[in-house]
């Protein structure tokens, strides 16, 4: 057998980063219990316990903040911590007596504890204006404004019927989980890109630009005697792929870009099958820096859900029970033609779940 050697191919095996109690009881866990907001214990068949303290953190972190988290992990949990897929930081403790001192230190640093169980978890989001060239709205700004209003649902000061997941993506390329979250905030472009014909031949390869369009809306054309392109607006879905390969095809517009709200997505197989999010509010104008219209719309949906849903019902299950007409009535939104999903390839027969229908 060949001798094992160290390479730089792939990440190191995750096992070397697991706390000893998890290694000893891997695959042998009996149950878990939420002790208080943001604190959970997993109990193994052997009686071993691992305590989790979940704290909120921004998606974009400074190195100094990460070092603070590492210092806290060294102090209270032998260096063991992890980040969740929704940007929470979780500290993994073997000693229950260190939970409260850790929470106290986190509070002094300004990081609240919560988000476990029937609570609102951190909002997973995309890059936004800080980095992405095709964003129809900002990510960090909108998420900060929304979480400032919904903060009591994270800490447990206000109750929810079940867990709630909110996601944000700055455009429909969707590098956030907006397709499968209870509430999704999605930046939308509403106009086809503007073509700068004078600059396009100097900056872009036309065959590559034509090939970049997933719907075939871009065609080669001659404009004022020089090679360029044309866009068939009926086929354009405002994805911005063309802008990615050619800066002369500009998708962003301060006047027509905005935000849409989607509801009813879920990943879990519990009770009903996983669901895709569905459109609730087609368009809200961008209004930085605090986006009051967007914040108000999301808060209204959360409060309406909290008031009307049954215990353990996710938003998708609540809407299935009361029906979409009643849902729109409760949130005060008019049903319009823009809510109709006319995408012909979205067949109901496509398998989206491990659940089987007999």
What positions do the PLM features span?
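A glycine-rich phosphate-binding loop feature that marks nucleotide/adenosyl-phosphate handling sites
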Residues: 123-126, 163-172, 315-328, 348-349
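Iron-sulfur cluster-binding cysteine motifs and their immediate structural context
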Residues: 208-231, 237-260
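Flexible, glycine/charged-enriched surface loops at secondary-structure junctions
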Residues: 78-85, 116-117, 156-163, 220-221, ...
């Amino acid at each position: 057998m060949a001798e094992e050697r160290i390479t730089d191919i792939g990440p190191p095996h995750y096992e070397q980063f697991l706390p000893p109690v998890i290694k000893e009881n891997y695959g042998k866990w009996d149950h878990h219990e939420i002790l208080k907001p943001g604190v959970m214990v997993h109990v193994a068949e052997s009686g071993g316990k691992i305590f989790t303290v979940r704290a909120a953190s921004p998606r974009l972190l400074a190195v100094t903040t990460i070092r603070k988290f590492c210092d806290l992990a060294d102090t209270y949990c032998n260096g063991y911590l992890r980040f969740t897929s929704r940007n929470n930081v979780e500290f993994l403790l073997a000693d229950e007596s260190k939970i409260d001192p850790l929470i106290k230190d986190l509070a002094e640093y300004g990081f609240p504890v919560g988000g476990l169980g029937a609570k609102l978890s951190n909002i997973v989001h995309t890059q936004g204006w800080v980095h992405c060239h095709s964003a129809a709205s900002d990510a960090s700004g909108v998420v900060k404004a929304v979480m400032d209003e919904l903060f009591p649902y994270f800490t447990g000061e206000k109750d929810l019927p079940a867990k709630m997941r909110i996601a944000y993506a700055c455009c429909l390329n969707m590098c956030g989980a907006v397709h499968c979250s209870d509430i999704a905030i999605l930046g939308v472009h509403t106009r086809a890109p503007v073509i700068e014909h004078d600059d396009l031949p100097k900056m872009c390869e036309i065959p590559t630009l034509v090939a970049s369009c997933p719907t075939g809306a871009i065609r080669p054309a001659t404009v004022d005697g020089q090679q360029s392109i044309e866009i068939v607006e009926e086929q354009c879905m405002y994805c911005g792929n063309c802008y990615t390969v050619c800066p002369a095809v500009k998708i962003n517009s301060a006047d027509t870009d905005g935000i849409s709200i989607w509801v009813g997505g879920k990943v879990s197989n519990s009770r009903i099958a996983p669901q895709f999010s569905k459109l609730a509010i087609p368009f809200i104008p961008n209004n930085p820096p605090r986006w009051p219209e967007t914040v108000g719309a999301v808060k209204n949906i959360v409060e309406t859900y909290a008031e009307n849903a049954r215990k353990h019902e996710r938003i998708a299950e609540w809407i299935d029970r009361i029906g979409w007409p009643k849902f729109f009535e409760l949130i005060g939104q008019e049903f319009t033609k823009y809510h109709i999903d006319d995408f012909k390839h979205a067949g109901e027969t496509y398998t989206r779940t491990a659940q089987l229908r007999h």
